[in-house]
Design a protein with these regions (language model features):
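Helical segment within the ABC ATPase nucleotide-binding domain
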Residues: 178-191
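Helix-to-loop junction immediately C-terminal to a conserved catalytic motif
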Residues: 55
Length: 239
């Protein structure tokens, strides 16, 4: 990344917690433009809280957040308008709706209709063509991998420049995870999208990441390319 290029998304001196319990403090973070950064760590390290704070779903008690170098106070609606999409842990699909309706609802929420809505839908189905196989099925009848694909596809409808993914591999076999991430990685490289991927499944996530950061007890203890982390036996023993 060029020294003159502002990160896609960054935080400086961030603090956040729950019910008086501090999750992280004085935390600095930067997602480079056009890269996939994988943030790894055990449960309770603060990864998901950071993701929620960056998208405006959890308040920060200290520090500042910048989007493409511009200071802002994140709110989900504003972040979405600025091209940031968030896929939460747990998939968040509506079990009673068929997949087509889930997409239609997302398009309606984004005030997209007619030819533009059809165009966006086709774009996503070209990236994730397996969704066509269960397009008319209720989300509650789908497997975990299929639900995750729907959740990611719904996020891609907005053509985000920044994508935040919270543990997309949960409950997925390694091949299913790779089937999900490979086309997303290809799209990211083609469009220059920036992706922050939060994971515990280190090996699978490294295969689709440009950089990796390790979070432990609310602190960043490593950041570099995946091969560099592989050389740190003590850090790898954490996983």
């Amino acid at each position: 990344m060029s020294g003159s290029t502002a990160p896609a998304l960054s935080g400086k001196g961030l603090g956040a917690g729950y019910g008086g319990r501090e999750v992280f403090s004085q935390f600095d973070f930067a997602l480079p433009q056009g890269e996939v950064l994988c943030l790894v760590g055990h449960n309770g390290a603060g990864k998901s809280t950071l993701l929620k704070a960056l998208f405006g779903l959890h308040p920060v008690s200290a520090g500042e957040i910048r989007l493409r170098g511009q200071l802002l106070k994140p709110r989900p609606e504003a972040m979405a308008r600025e091209g940031v999409a968030y896929v939460p842990e747990g998939r968040g699909v509506f079990p009673g709706l068929v997949v087509r309706e889930i997409f239609q609802l997302a398009l309606w929420s984004a005030k997209l209709d007619g030819a533009e809505a059809e165009k966006r839908t086709e774009e996503v189905l070209e990236v994730l063509p397996r969704i066509r196989e269960f397009w008319t099925r209720r989300a509650g009848t789908l497997s975990g991998g299929q639900q995750q694909m729907v959740s990611v596809g719904r996020a891609l409808l907005s053509r985000p420049s920044i994508l935040l993914l919270d543990e997309p591999s949960i409950g997925l076999a390694p091949k299913t995870f790779q089937d999900l991430m490979a086309p997303i990685r290809a799209l990211q490289q083609r469009l220059g999208m920036s992706i922050l991927l939060v994971e515990q499944n280190v090996g699978e996530a490294f295969a689709v990441s440009d950089r990796v950061a390790v979070m432990k007890s609310g602190r960043m203890i490593f950041e570099g390319v995946p091969d560099d982390l592989s050389d740190h036996a003590k850090l790898m023993d954490m996983f």
